[in-house]
Amino acid sequence: MLRRALLNIYSKEFHPASEIEVCLFNEIWAQINNAAKEGFRQSRAADPDEDFRNEILRNNAVFSAFKVHRMQNDMARLLLDSKGNLKPFEQWKNEVMPIASHQVGTWLRTEYDTAVIRAHQAADWRQFEREKDILPNLRWVESTSIHPGLDHKRFWGTIRPIDDAFWSEHRPGDRWNCKCSLSSTDEPETPVPESSPLDKPQKGLENNPGKDAKLFSDQHPYQSGAREGAKKAVDKLMARIDEMIDEMSNNLTYEEKMAIARNNLEIENSLKVTKGRPMSVEEADKQNANPRHVNELVLDPAGIYRDGRGNRYSRNKNYDRTRDMPYSINCQTCAPAYALRLRGFDVTAKGNTPGSKLEYLSRGHAFEVWMNADGTPARHVSINSWLDAKGYQRMTPKRYMEYFNEVCKEEGVYELCIGWKGGSGHATILQRFADGELRYIEPQSDNSEGSGMEWKDVKYLCEKGASTSHNCRGVMRVDNKLFNLKFIEIFDV
């Protein structure tokens, strides 16, 4: 990640004053969000208050963007030598490594630990607000640190009403890595301890995250001491992220939407394109994901070839085996191409050629192009594991239909890897729509209504599916997944 980020900053196309480097931003935002979620898990708050927690996660993006803007500009200042010439990349990289080590190493660790604590406290505070009619006061609980600092010791045991001005001036969590906490109580309040200017919150921790949903305040040096252009660059990035989130389907959680927005930024950066508005099924389908595919046989009432359904075909005079075969064996690219087209990326599938990433995917690795929202490898629901759970020995057309309806129950887009009765296999798309319809969408070659091949439907898959399968066969929902950039080269743009 760091090398990619440094290459981006070094690039002549990147403008450190007006842009935010995407690789660093995504990594830091993800780390701070992980810290926040860890803090939420540690909280004893009974009501999850999802809207408030989502607001914290979004505000983490703002903090991360300001942090990256500071870091990238500190690095960019070292790009030129004393004569104004661009330094060789390796020399510059070595010179900026201390900045990187501090910002994404030591200091990010401190920010992570503090974010855990303050997210925990924010969730607790919301709970205190909800129950203040019963437990109107808060007690300052002493630090759990093995070596607690003395600066908060005078406040230990202090009890004040939750709405008391004291809590606006002093709180657990207003020191980096502070391990004091609060508890709600109906015990009587105690006098306010004496304090001095030395007891003021540390920079960046002046706010109450339980009130404004910000783990770090707007007075943090990344913002109060921001480099020129920072606010404009951050606002532009956040507007782009908000736009992408707003256009996503409501069958995704807010966390999934944020993760996909990050993934979209990385895809844009890797492909050097700008994502458009989400495509309709018709725009993404109708062989638009694989436009260079040419059918070897075409429907012809007088044709000499016939399939099991009685349809007649003749050879396509425009078919060139050398040219066209790679686009008939590239289904493992067509399926993700369709999914990314739905997001708004005008990508198409490359042909399957020896030694390519696509050839690797075609050898039982098709699902490796997808990751979970947290970046971990995504796992499909294999046909074999489903058979075992059901106590079945083998698949039948009826069982395939049962399997599809169970694993594709939620509205969404699903990639299917299926083995055929006659051998070989195929990767394709099943899509569950809001009205409950489950549709077989073939992104490699058109099977949409009016194509003449619309008889290739879900029932067709059930009838053609093999009775026994390799473990690589199965189904995975992919519209809520991230695309693995390791395989970005399988697309044309």
Model features per residue range: what roles?
Residues 1-100, 185-269:
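N-terminal leader/targeting and assembly helices and adjacent pre-domain segments
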Residues 63, 67-71, 263-372:
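Active-site nucleophile-adjacent alpha helix/oxyanion-hole segment immediately C-terminal to the catalytic cysteine
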Residues 81, 89-134:
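Internal glycine-rich, Lys/Arg-flanked active-site/core loops of soluble domains
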Residues 109, 135-137, 175-179, 413, ...:
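Extracellular structured ligand-interaction cores
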Residues 115-188:
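Conserved short secondary-structure elements within globular domains
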Residues 158-221, 445-479, 483:
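Compact mixed alphabeta submodule
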Residues 347, 351-438:
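Papain-like cysteine protease catalytic cores
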Residues 397-493:
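Active-site or metal-binding loop neighborhoods of secreted/extracellular toxin and effector enzymes
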